[in-house]
Amino acid sequence: MTIRNLTLILALLLIFPSAAKAGTINRAQHRDHFTELEVEQIKETQILDKRIGVFVKAIARRLRVLTGATTDTAKQQKKDAELYGALPTGSRADLIGDIGKILDEAITNIDDVSARDEKNPLIPTALRLLANEAKRVVEQLQPFQSQASSDAEVASIEQVTENAESILAAANKLPPPVAKDKKKKQE
């Protein structure tokens, strides 16, 4: 690199200092939709239906913060905090947006496994698990639709609804679950 090029770059940075800061501001404003311990749980959980279970747990934690409702005992809350970290924080729009992103990531996980092995027996199980949670999410977020106070909230609710609808549509295409016989019928 020549001195002339360096001089030109420095001059541009002095003239447009906001351009240099733009990258750091965007990174600082980026919000991760999982806590650090949730990410660790996801990385450790390689079996599809169990991994989707971690996504479902992450969604349930955000719904608990949004609604303020909990049915967990103090012992269960302590165990969850050890496994998944502190409950997530943020505005209502942030938490609803997190749920939309988590649903999207769960869809991607199922799609990835399906692309590699269409006949994987865990796909229907994982999809049904996710569909049950998607249905619950839509039901619990309905009151928030009328209370939405910002465009970000409205957009987040729309994203969640769209993801939930695609999950439910895919689950409706599944054949009925096969009942597992724990014991063979005796003749």
Regions found by a protein language model. Name each.
Residues 1-5:
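Positively charged n-region of N-terminal signal peptides that target proteins for export
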Residues 7-17:
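Bacterial N-terminal signal peptides
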Residues 22-187:
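Long, charged/polar, soluble alpha-helical segments
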